[in-house]
């Protein structure tokens, strides 16, 4: 029968190359010790009348994972660009576990005969090593949930201090400017460099620079305010989503 590989023969070589790149990126992800929690997302299915028909789990395949790794690359590149050009912007910051949460999770794990490595300063690799060791246990989901809750909540901040869970020293959000305001802010920051006539080897000047896009009216004080507001708005949206999904289930 007719195969998709025949229909998309013109892009197949690029897809094969992209898949090879994805495998290298996944290997690098493992080597830097990024945490890979096995969580299941759900989606709402609507009927012909736009009424909710069912809620089903999203089945992740390699296509989803390829896109995810590409997005991570874009976000890391954004953080590096913002830092290089000394732009006040919003980084995605994820601190390690607090002393209180770390003590609580160690107490819980100890009752199960488990141990989280790293002493007083565990790394993301220590978390991932423990996750790998429990994946075949019947209570793996419970243990994973407790471990996840021991971590700090990621926030938006103009101070770049790394992302504990992903194992990055610098990280920012860039890929979703139509739905996340921090991404839009970072797009504006990048455009201000592109259209501002700055000499840089990583910027290709546009044929017709737009002076309006070169204007970037934000300072660190404003970024502090935006970081606090967008972090709060994200938590509020997440809480609302969980409440609605729990009610519908």
Where do the protein language model's features map onto the residues?
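Electropositive polyanion-binding surfaces
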Residues: 1-249
